[in-house]
A protein has these predicted regions:
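C-terminal regions of mature proteins
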Residues: 2-122, 128-132, 146, 230, ...
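Generic hydrophobic alpha-helical scaffold/packing signal
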Residues: 161, 170, 174, 206, ...
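Short acidic (Asp/Glu) and glycine-rich catalytic loops that position anionic groups and cofactors
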Residues: 43-49, 76-80, 134-141, 150-153, ...
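A structural supersecondary motif
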Residues: 143-145, 161-200
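C-terminal structural cap/anchor segments
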Residues: 187-252
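Extended hydrophobic-aromatic, low-complexity segments
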Residues: 94-95, 151-153, 170-172, 181-184, ...
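Active/ligand-binding-proximal structured segments within catalytic/core domains
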Residues: 1, 152-163
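A generic structural motif
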Residues: 87-91, 148, 196-202
């Protein structure tokens, strides 16, 4: 068990060094939505727990094993079970036959035990946090939830992603600011996030994010240019999927309650996005930036020089 925990710890430390942008995004998302807060439990918030377990394993091994047993009983049972399979239609009957013993074992394990669906109480509140490290660059992330602010997530946001990434952010953050790049994240839960990566700046990048709405209000493009943006966006939407990816995507949409009709509606909105549609996103983007949810993963010295921007300074891997 200790070896597995040490392996987990090493992988988490490596992830913080090599995927710092994902750490910043996950932390930011925990300020924005309940789903983000839940997912972040297994990200940076888990590291101090794993670190303490590996450092003090002998003192805590019995309590840890007892808790593992409790978790196992909650997980390995047939109550509330949903199973997804991606398979050729002709092979399904064989799969159903092969999976039956496992289902029976799970049913026996959970016999006479009631496992209730959990409604976790997770605080979601506006925060400004800096994650301090020895990194020589910053990963600056800012965002909010569109639905909470009364806005709809339409297909035009997918075109906006292309437009910002390769136009506005490219010029302001990469060319002028010297960062490796910047991107957006829009998901089906209504979460929207901007993030820069390998960025020598901090406050300057936040200013660029905050001025995005002004850029959108003055946005101009010819029909030919809009067609180019839409085609570029569709090339990412219609990416061929392996059977595994198809199955994962189907389960993700199922659990989120996203219907085929909703997906088609967004697709049509994307295909027919106009200059006016892009301009009309300005109030939503402005409202999201005014929420001032902020997470920066970066150099401790640079962060301390800008500490007035943050409520909380958190050392990572301290």
């Amino acid at each position: 068990i200790l070896e597995l925990l040490q392996q987990d710890r090493s992988e988490m430390e490596l992830n913080m060094l090599q995927s710092s942008v994902q750490v910043a995004l996950a932390r930011l998302n925990s300020f924005i939505s309940k789903a983000g807060a839940y997912n972040e439990i297994g990200e940076l918030s888990l590291y101090p727990v794993v670190k303490k377990l590996t450092d003090e394993f002998e003192e805590n091994v019995e309590d840890f094993c007892s808790k593992l047993q409790q978790v196992g009983e909650l997980l390995f049972n047939s109550q509330n079970l949903v199973m997804g399979v991606t398979i050729e239609e002709g092979l399904y009957s064989k799969f159903a036959q092969e999976i039956t013993p496992l289902l029976e074992t799970l049913a026996e394990a959970s016999a006479n035990k009631s496992v209730q669906l959990q409604d976790y109480v997770l605080p979601v509140e506006n925060q400004q946090e800096a994650l301090m490290s020895s990194s020589q660059v910053q990963y600056v992330a800012k965002g909010a939830n569109l639905y909470k602010l009364g806005y709809e997530m339409t297909g035009a946001y997918q075109v906006l992603d292309m437009l910002l990434r390769y136009e506005y952010f490219w010029v302001k953050i990469r060319v002028q600011g010297g960062a490796y790049g910047a991107m957006t994240r829009f998901n089906l839960d209504g979460d929207m996030m901007f993030v820069s990566y390998r960025d020598p700046n901090l406050a300057e990048t936040i200013k660029v994010f905050d001025e995005t709405a002004d850029f959108l209000r003055g946005f101009e493009a010819s029909d030919r240019e809009m067609t180019k943006y839409i085609i570029g966006t569709m090339s990412g939407v219609d990416t061929p999927m392996t059977p595994r990816l198809l199955g994962n995507n189907a389960q993700r949409l199922y659990f989120r309650g996203v219907t085929y009709e909703e997906r088609q509606k967004r697709r049509q909105q994307l295909l027919h996005t106009t200059v006016e549609d892009i301009r009309n996103l300005a109030p939503a983007i402005e409202a999201c930036m005014e929420e001032n949810n902020l997470c920066v993963f970066g150099n401790a010295g640079v962060i301390k020089a800008n500490e007035g921007l943050f409520q909380k300074l958190t050392p990572v891997m301290d």
